[in-house]
Amino acid sequence: MSRLVYVIFLLVVVEGSRNTLERNTETNATEAKVEGKGTIKLPPNVTIPGIITFGDSIVDSGNNNHLRTALKCNFPPYGKDFPGKIATGRFSDGRVPSDIVAERLGIAETIPAYLNPKLKNEDLLKGVNFASGGSGYDPLTAKLVKVVSLSDQLKNFQEYKNKLKVIVGEEKANFLVKNSLYLVVASSNDIAHTYTARSIKYNKTSYADYLADSASKFVSALYGLGARRIGVFSAVPVGCVPAARTLRGKLKRRCSEKLNEVARNFNAKISPTLEALGKELPDSRVVLIDVCDTLNDMIENPKNYGFEVSNRGCCGTGLVEVLFLCNKINPFTCKNSSSYIFWDSYHPTEKAYQIIVDKLLGNYITKLV
């Protein structure tokens, strides 16, 4: 089968199954528990005991495995570069940003998914991951694909706090909750998917305002539950991910300026909003982590970062494959994912994540502690 015929076939499958396909495959594979060595030196007398993560598929470490949703990736070739080559449910070839941050801070090599029923008590003591692929700041985003909304992720966090108190006592539990680093990664699904469904009610500017307001309310609620060190990822150039180029960029597969404009509007709104919120909430460190400029530069200048390909993913043809379309029987998957910025048509490779984290963590960590 030629590459062109295969792509046409995949596009038909994507359109035909977008709102109807639902899977219920699960994996409870045990993740690697190797401790990270740490490459970021913290200021004297500063401790970050754990990493606690909320958001979407950029950081989901396997929570969707345990949901009745089509948005899963707990099968090969996902995870091919993960320790042990395990498809854990991370939407990448390897680890995701929250794992890499934890390693760089010397906490652990990976941060587990909270919904994994095989978690042991000791797994909870270095932080957990509540993120659910397909979620977003807009409540409709998670509802459309039957995943864990951000509001329900907060409920899971409250449950987690109660478990900590039982395991280590109230004093140690409060210390972990207060001093852990919180990562919030959302907005991509809102912009790439839900914005179209909301376009009757919102334009590009008003929808960005709505998302920024929702993000601010989420951070305030997280603070109310005890979080103090909160890093919020900016929106990324959603219009430049391979799938957006294929579905919206016409024959030349250019970036979707419409989607990128919504992302820029959101970033312009959320930046002063979070800055004001940080001043309003006592003893808080609320910081916007600007991922957009770094990823955009990587996409425009891939060779400067050691990549060869930035407009296609490694999996399959790299044009539309994601989730079940990115599978081990796809004949076009690349052999060397480290040459690609994107693993599938939406999500970066671990190598790309490592570059982003290493470029940004050193700049932002002092603001967060």
From Swiss-Prot:
It is found in: Secreted. Gene3D superfamilies: SGNH hydrolase. Residues 1-16 form the signal peptide. GO terms for biological process: lipid catabolic process. GO terms for cellular component: extracellular region. Its main location: secreted. Its EC number is 3.1.1.-. Glycans are attached at residues 28, 45, 203, 336. InterPro entries: GDSL, GDSL_lipolytic_enzyme, SGNH_hydro_sf, SGNH_plant_lipase-like. Keywords: Glycoprotein, Hydrolase, Lipid degradation, Lipid metabolism, Secreted, Signal. The active site is at residues 57, 344, 347. GO terms for molecular function: hydrolase activity, acting on ester bonds. It holds the Pfam family Lipase_GDSL. Belongs to the 'GDSL' lipolytic enzyme family. This is GDSL esterase/lipase At5g42170. It comes from Arabidopsis thaliana (Mouse-ear cress).
